[in-house]
């Protein structure tokens, strides 16, 4: 036989048969080797044809394997290595296969011709085929359903058989099988798609919209309507095939192979005479798909059929990709009719989630509260700004359900703690068993008593946990069964099988519903007892997931955090001394935000801190970050002195297209995208170029900035603090005797501020806070704070440091300058106190666990160790 007259798959099967014979130490390749290799290929044509005939493939394969084992094997010195003979039976089989190819007017001998030749085989294979009722007639019948009226004109024809099943999914069949979730709403878009599909020409809708708004769901909704026959007469009995472009392209090694596959798909659709609607998700992938030098891409192959109306195609793609790929090819674009899929509102999303609720409950085996559904829609809309409804809300519910599900499957915390304690005591028991002294024996007895008690508790808890798990799984299984029966009822009613419908509606379904109700009531009764497992998804779980995703504290305040927030003003005052007004205004803004009564479309608070250097402006921002997030690292600090040139503005929001660094994003916008809940400190704003403030206007008013990539960055959960030294000279000179700022000084400072910044900028700031110069008493408090920080650094060596009143007076006198604030004081303590301590520590005069007193003698600071 000429191998060139065989298809690639037949050649591969013969080669595999040779390898099989060698592995079994056979001297010849026979028909049974070839049969076994054809059955070995899972996705092969032989397997597909036998599946159509309802043949048990595994049993047939075992039968063939049994025949192979009967063959004599030759090993040892008598075996001729590398020599294989083809039996006369196999040669005759291939000759018969050639005749079958001629009968079917095919150019090459394909796998189906070999199978037809097997049906005329005598001996063991004939008996095997008879056992499985495989005859030439029923084989030909199955072959026609797989192959249709195609001829074998190439060496790889198997790739073009059942092309749609191989390279696509039947959405209507999936709906019937209950694999697709229900589609709620979207009626106007589905109606528009139906109208376009009912046109004579250009009947190809393309769904365009943002990612996650439900474009694919609209097509699934159409498939559900087709199943329910809730479509016009022209669309009844249609089927929707979702084309998998990646499967089409994958493995197409040679030129023309991709085109051959796609042509096979298109021919099947053409032959269906409009019965098949082709759905291409990510439509932009057809532009350039399979394009190599001199070849056509998928888009150009589709155009003629689209224009003639031979191909009903539904596309779906995002706005950006439609603009980038489809609009650039006007000939392709004009063949599609646009259907814009808008993002649903929060109310619509709540309806969608209510429709999906039962599917999630069945899948995860949990109960979802309606409050959780409302929370998922509202919180995702407010806090997750870079994604779209309903996708982000569905993800929240799904993850919250998964969290509860993993808790159900994992060991409860209480039981885990008891089990670990038992393990710990068992280790101790083994160790004490080796000791012979009286004390160890007494401890062993006590330990064994405790161990037996704990084991009893653990076994009780384990039994309770298993029972609770069993109850939850029982409810889940009943729900799944009920859903299956409802699907069967729908199918029976659709097929007018009234007997089956009556049996389901009045017999099986009420019985399962009754059983489910009893199981749920039992579960509700058990819930009143102290349960180990929880199966409810509430708004707290949703809020936890939002907090985990975004870092924004959305969950209800726990007691510790509530106390911390109420004491926020006091906490800030401990670190920022002498600036009561500033501390009060900032803490009030944070309280309003956490109580949920702030304007949701503006930042938590925006402040301008004015005052001389070293009075606590930057320190307050750091303290706020530390108090809210337990870390000063959560503060986004931008030194505005770096933005003195006009072009430096682009560094905040990213370079415009065409400039170096366009892909990198802006320093401010990228930082906030990663930490949406943070304190933003714009230090020394008067140093920045006036153009910078134009960018800040939207941030202060609407809580958002659009960066150079066109992404909207959300500032609604940030505290914006801007510091400036404007008017500090007036503040230094204009103090009352009680330390407050004179009214005329305040007016002078505000006048200078208005002269430097535009009214539209100042008008958007919540509060302009004047920091007053520090008085001597406040400076003493700062000295205490500096010493406390020093003690913190020495805490691991258990060394305490104390300054006498005289030493404090001396430090204040020598180190404080009203013009420079508290910073010189810190430097003075560093130079005079810390240096002396360091010298004594290195000399080992001060040892661990010492108490150090700093005093004044002969007009200088001295260190005494006690």
From Swiss-Prot:
GO terms for molecular function: ATP binding; ATP hydrolysis activity. Residues 774-866 are annotated as: C-terminal. The keyword Aminoacyl-tRNA synthetase does not apply. Keywords: ATP-binding, Chaperone, Coiled coil, Cytoplasm, Nucleotide-binding, Repeat, Stress response. One of its GO terms (cellular component) is cytoplasm. Transmembrane segments: none annotated. Gene3D superfamilies: 1.10.8.60, Clp, N-terminal domain (1.10.1780.10), P-loop containing nucleotide triphosphate hydrolases (3.40.50.300). PROSITE patterns: CLP_R (PS51903), CLPAB_1 (PS00870), CLPAB_2 (PS00871). GO terms for biological process: cellular response to heat; protein refolding. Its main location: cytoplasm. Pfam families: AAA, AAA_2, AAA_lid_9, Clp_N, ClpB_D2-small. Residues 3-149 form the Clp R domain. Residues 344-551 are annotated as: Linker. Residues 394-528 form a coiled coil. ATP 2 binds at residues 611-618. It is found in: Cytoplasm. Homohexamer. The oligomerization is ATP-dependent. Part of a stress-induced multi-chaperone system, it is involved in the recovery of the cell from heat-induced damage, in cooperation with DnaK, DnaJ and GrpE. Acts before DnaK, in the processing of protein aggregates. Protein binding stimulates the ATPase activity; ATP hydrolysis unfolds the denatured protein aggregates, which probably helps expose new hydrophobic binding sites on the surface of ClpB-bound aggregates, contributing to the solubilization and refolding of denatured protein aggregates by DnaK. Belongs to the ClpA/ClpB family. The Clp repeat (R) domain probably functions as a substrate-discriminating domain, recruiting aggregated proteins to the ClpB hexamer and/or stabilizing bound proteins. The NBD2 domain is responsible for oligomerization, whereas the NBD1 domain stabilizes the hexamer probably in an ATP-dependent manner. The movement of the coiled-coil domain is essential for ClpB ability to rescue proteins from an aggregated state, probably by pulling apart large aggregated proteins, which are bound between the coiled-coils motifs of adjacent ClpB subunits in the functional hexamer. This is Chaperone protein ClpB.
């Amino acid at each position: 036989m000429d191998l060139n007259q065989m298809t690639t798959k037949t050649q591969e099967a013969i080669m595999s048969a040779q390898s099989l014979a060698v592995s079994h130490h056979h001297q010849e390749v026979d028909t049974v080797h070839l049969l076994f290799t054809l059955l070995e290929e899972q996705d092969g044509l032989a397997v597909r044809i036998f599946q159509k005939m309802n043949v048990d493939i595994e049993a047939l394969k075992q039968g063939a394997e049994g025949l192979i084992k009967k063959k004599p094997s030759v090993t040892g010195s008598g075996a001729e290595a590398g020599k294989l003979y083809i039996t006369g039976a196999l040669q005759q089989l291939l000759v018969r296969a050639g005749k079958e190819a001629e009968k079917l007017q095919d150019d090459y001998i394909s796998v189906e011709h070999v199978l037809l030749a097997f049906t005329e085989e005598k001996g063991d294979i004939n008996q095997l085929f008879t056992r499985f009722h495989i005859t030439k007639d029923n084989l030909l019948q199955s072959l026609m359903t797989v192959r249709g009226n195609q001829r074998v004109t190439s060496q790889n024809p198997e790739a073009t058989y059942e092309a749609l099943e191989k390279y696509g999914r039947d959405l209507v069949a999936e709906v019937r099988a209950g694999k697709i979730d229900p589609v709620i709403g979207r009626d106007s878009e589905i109606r528009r798609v139906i109208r376009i599909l009912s046109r004579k020409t250009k009947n190809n809708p393309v769904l365009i919209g943002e990612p996650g708004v439900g474009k694919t769901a609209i097509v699934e909704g159409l498939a559900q309507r087709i199943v329910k026959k809730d479509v016009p007469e022209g669309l009844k009995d249609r089927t929707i095939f979702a084309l998998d472009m990646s499967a089409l392209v994958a493995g197409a090694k040679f030129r023309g192979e991709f085109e051959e596959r796609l042509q096979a798909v298109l021919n099947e659709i053409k032959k269906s005479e409009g019965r098949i609607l082709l759905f291409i998700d990510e439509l932009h992938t057809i532009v350039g798909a399979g394009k190599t030098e001199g070849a056509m891409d998928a888009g150009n192959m589709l155009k003629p059929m689209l224009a003639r109306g031979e191909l009903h195609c539904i596309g779906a793609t995002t706005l950006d990709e439609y603009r980038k790929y489809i609009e650039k090819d006007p000939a392709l674009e004009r063949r599609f009719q646009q259907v814009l899929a808008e993002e649903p509102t929060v109310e619509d999303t709540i309806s969608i989630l209510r429709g999906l609720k039962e599917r999630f409950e069945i899948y995860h085996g949990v109960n979802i509260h309606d409050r959780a559904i409302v929370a998922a829609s509202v919180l995702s809309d407010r806090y997750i700004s870079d994604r779209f409804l309903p996708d982000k809300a569905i993800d929240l519910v799904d993850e919250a359900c998964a969290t509860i599900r993993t808790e159900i499957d994992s060991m409860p915390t209480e039981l885990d703690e008891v089990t670990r304690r038992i393990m710990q005591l068992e280790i101790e028991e083994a160790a004490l068993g080796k000791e012979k002294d009286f004390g160890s024996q007494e401890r062993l007895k006590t330990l064994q008593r405790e161990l037996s008690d704990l084991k009893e508790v653990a076994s009780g808890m384990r039994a309770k946990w298993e029972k609770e798990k069993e109850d939850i799984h029982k409810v889940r299984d009943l729900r799944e069964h009920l859903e299956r029966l409802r699907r069967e009822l729908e199918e029976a009613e659709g097929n007018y099988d009234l007997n089956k419908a009556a049996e389901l509606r009045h017999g099986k379904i009420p019985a399962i519903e009754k059983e489910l109700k009893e199981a749920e009531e039992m579960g509700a009764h058990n819930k009143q007892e102290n349960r180990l497992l929880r199966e409810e998804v509430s708004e707290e779980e949703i809020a936890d997931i939002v907090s985990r995703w975004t870092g924004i504290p959305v969950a209800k305040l726990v007691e510790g955090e509530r106390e911390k927030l109420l004491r926020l003003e006091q906490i800030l005052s401990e670190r920022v001394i002498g600036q009561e007004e500033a501390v009060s205004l900032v803490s009030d803004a944070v309280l309003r935000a956490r109580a949920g009564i702030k304007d949701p479309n503006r930042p938590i608070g925006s402040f301008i801190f004015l005052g001389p250097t070293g009075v606590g402006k930057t320190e307050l921002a750091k303290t706020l970050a530390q108090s809210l997030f337990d870390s000063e690292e959560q503060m986004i600090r931008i030194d505005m002195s770096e933005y003195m040139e006009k072009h430096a503005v682009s560094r905040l929001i990213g370079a415009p297209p065409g400039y170096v660094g366009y892909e990198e994003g802006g320093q401010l916008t990228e930082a906030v995208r990663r930490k949406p809940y943070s304190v933003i400190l714009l230090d020394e704003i008067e140093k920045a170029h006036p153009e910078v403030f134009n960018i800040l206007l939207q941030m202060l008013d609407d809580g958002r900035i659009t960066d150079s990539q066109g992404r909207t960055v959300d500032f609604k959960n940030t505290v914006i603090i801007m510091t400036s030294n404007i008017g500090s000279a007036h503040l230094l000179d204009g103090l009352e005797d009680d330390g407050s700022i004179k009214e005329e000084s305040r007016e002078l400072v505000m006048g200078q501020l208005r002269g430097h910044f535009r009214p539209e900028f100042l008008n958007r700031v919540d509060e302009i806070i004047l920091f007053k110069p520090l008085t001597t008493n406040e400076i003493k408090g700062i000295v205490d704070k500096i010493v406390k920080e020093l003690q913190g650094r020495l805490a691991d060596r258990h060394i305490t440091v104390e300054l006498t009143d005289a030493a404090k007076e001396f430090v204040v006198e020598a180190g404080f300058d009203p013009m420079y604030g508290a910073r010189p004081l810190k430097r003075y303590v560093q130079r005079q106190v810390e240096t002396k301590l360091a010298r004594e520590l290195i000399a080992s005069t001060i040892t661990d666990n010492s108490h150090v007193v700093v005093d004044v003698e002969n007009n200088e600071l001295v260190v005494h160790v006690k």
